[in-house]
């Protein structure tokens, strides 16, 4: 285990040396970081690049030789989902952070480009009840998404609207001009996006998420982008399967709230 190393961002010329450490992972957010589209790669300082972290928004993928300093490093997030490459990383996270890291399971969805039925997806969009309207996210809707905690993740990965306009894609459903559900690109990589789905609590289980997600998937297919899906819970798996995806496997993550530096000094 590597100890007592200064952590720094990976230099562009080092990415090719780091990429093999992530070779066994089919995670679009890792691809975003490696391609330099979004996110960052972090490494312990030194000439031997044997450990790395791919961090994008709330996700941090830890790979290579376990390094305690990469677990305790402040990635600048109030909430972080740490994804260990293997059991050695998982053991290190538990050893270093203890009960400050909540053990959770997430659900990987297969990446199958030909799994979608465009007619079925179009029907799901058109099934939207009359009191609702669906809109592509523009500047006004981008700003409205940021006004509420439940909808902020639809666009918060993009520091400004211009960034979202350049890289992002998304749709929201409104009622009387107010956003009640949405589907957007949580992140972007060269060949596609990672999907984010959010619905205001009192509007859930009304088919709104299916309509918004269908509109997003159809637009991705029209643009030649792959709409990747990763599920937080089994309800998200069920929605994905309704839209044509297939479940792949469960995987372990650790949810860490608040600043890591503060956490580690708290009794």
Listing of model-derived features with the role each one plays in the protein:
Residues 38-144, 255:
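Acyl-donor-binding surface of acyltransferase catalytic domains
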Residues 160-192, 196-200:
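A conserved beta-strand-loop-helix scaffold within acyl/acetyltransferase catalytic domains
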């Amino acid at each position: 285990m590597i100890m007592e190393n200064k952590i720094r961002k990976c230099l562009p010329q080092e990415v090719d040396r780091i990429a093999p450490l992530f070779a066994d992972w089919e995670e679009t957010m890792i691809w975003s970081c490696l391609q330099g589209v979004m996110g960052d790669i972090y490494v312990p300082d030194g000439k031997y690049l044997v450990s790395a972290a791919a961090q994008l928004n709330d996700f941090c993928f830890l790979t290579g030789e376990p390094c305690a300093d990469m677990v305790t490093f402040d990635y600048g997030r109030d909430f972080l989902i740490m994804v260990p490459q293997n059991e050695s990383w998982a053991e290190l996270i538990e050893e270093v952070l203890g009960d400050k890291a909540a053990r959770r399971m997430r659900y990987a969805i297969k990446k199958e480009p030909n799994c979608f039925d465009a007619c079925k997806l179009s029907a799901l969009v058109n099934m939207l009840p009359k009191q609702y309207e669906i809109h592509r996210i523009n500047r006004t809707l981008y700003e409205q998404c940021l006004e509420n905690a439940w909808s902020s993740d639809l666009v918060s990965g993009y520091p400004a609207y211009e960034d979202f306009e350049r890289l992002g894609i998304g749709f929201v459903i409104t009622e009387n001009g107010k956003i009640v559900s949405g589907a957007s690109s949580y992140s972007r990589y060269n060949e596609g996006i990672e999907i984010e789905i959010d619905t205001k609590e009192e509007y859930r289980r009304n088919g709104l998420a299916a309509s918004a997600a269908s509109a997003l998937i159809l637009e991705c297919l029209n643009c030649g982008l792959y709409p990747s899906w990763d599920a937080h819970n089994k309800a998200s798996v069920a929605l994905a399967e309704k839209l044509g995806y297939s479940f792949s496997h469960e995987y372990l993550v650790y949810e860490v709230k608040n600043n890591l530096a503060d956490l580690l000094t708290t009794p």
